[in-house]
């Protein structure tokens, strides 16, 4: 059972890494369609980073109150909803609004699963955990590239 949980955590960290590099890969196509300056991606990144910091600092209280499983479930759901919000956002400010749950979800799941692995597994698994985040961060643009360069029925601003 411990191996099963570890595999699930590794998969969660792959999925945690996937959206982290998508904005940078998609922004060249999104930016002209949204009609915003190139540096607006930095605003979105800062909102996500701010949410991540807030969630990370609140993680201890959340984990004690709700447990790792519930925090992870809510965090992954928030991140998935944020990605859906990115995909459906009609304008930049809707993207900025979706960036809030993106950061909060990413920060809480990151802190929660790191804590769980640190408490229940050997130290080497922490290195593997972050390796799998890197796999996800690498795969994000790889998955996005064929979508963004084929002329599917998706508008260019809805690539993410």
Regions found by a protein language model. Give the residues of each.
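Extracytoplasmic
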Residues: 12-28
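Helix-breaking motifs and short loop linkers at transmembrane-helix boundaries and internal kinks
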Residues: 35, 67, 88-90
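Residue-level signature of mid-helix packing/kink "hotspots" within the transmembrane helices
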Residues: 49-53, 57, 138
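Conserved MFS/SLC helix-loop-helix module at the cytosolic interface between two early adjacent transmembrane helices
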Residues: 56-79, 83-86
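Small-residue (Gly/Pro/Ala) motifs that create kinks and tight helix-helix packing interfaces
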Residues: 59, 140-148
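Paired small-residue
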Residues: 93-101
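Cytoplasmic helix-loop-helix junction between adjacent transmembrane helices
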Residues: 100-129
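Conserved small/polar residues in nucleotide/adenosyl-binding loops
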Residues: 150-156
């Amino acid at each position: 059972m411990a191996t099963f949980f570890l595999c699930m955590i590794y998969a969660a960290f792959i999925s945690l890494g996937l959206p982290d590099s998508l904005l940078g890969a998609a922004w060249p196509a999104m930016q002209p369609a949204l009609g915003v300056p190139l540096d607006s991606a930095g605003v979105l990144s800062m909102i996500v980073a701010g949410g991540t910091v807030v969630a990370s600092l609140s993680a201890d209280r959340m984990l004690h109150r709700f447990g790792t499983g519930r925090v992870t479930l809510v965090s992954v759901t928030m991140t998935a909803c944020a990605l859906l919000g990115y995909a459906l956002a009609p304008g930049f400010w809707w993207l900025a609004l979706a960036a809030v749950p993106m950061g909060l979800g990413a920060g809480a799941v990151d802190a929660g699963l790191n804590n769980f692995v640190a408490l229940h597994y050997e130290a080497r698994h922490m290195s593997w955990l972050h390796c799998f985040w890197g796999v996800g961060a690498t795969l994000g643009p790889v998955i996005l590239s064929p979508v963004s360069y084929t002329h599917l029925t998706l508008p260019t601003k809805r690539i993410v």
